[in-house]
Amino acid sequence: FYIWIFRGTPLLVQLFVVFFGLSRVGVLLDPFPAAVIVFSLNEGAYCAETIRAALESVPKGQLEAGQCVGLTYLQTIFRIVLPQAMRTAFPPLSNSLISMVKDTSLAANITVTEMFMVTQRIVARTYEPLLLYLEVGLIYLIFSTVLTWVQRFGEKKLASYGHKEG
């Protein structure tokens, strides 16, 4: 139910429901904690599905093989199943992180002061929207590019995990 709700509704709607809706029932949150809660719940839903799919991608025989060589259930999970699942899950989890970084601009809609909101304030004073929004886009692009490089490095490390050269 949780995953269905958070994957099936727009992030902006989730921000509004938590920030404005909870105040209607007496739960008052400042904008920043409300945004942190929503981003955490939203990303958690996507990450849960990614990890579930990655775990299901590991053949059942791997679990049986680990137990046949004398490993306990937990040893089999941590030494055999999870390393394989993480190789599968790492790229989509990294992509989710990159998307979340870009989605933080939505928090301006509940008055969280972040880069996009600051830019809107400057635009209101200078009447120079194009250049300023291009600069914000460039900053997001640079940050996303760095995260992509980190992702590729992590993928290479995970791909070589367990493969000893000899």
Task: Pin down the residues of each PLM region.
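Transmembrane alpha-helices and adjacent helix-loop boundaries
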Residues: F1-G166
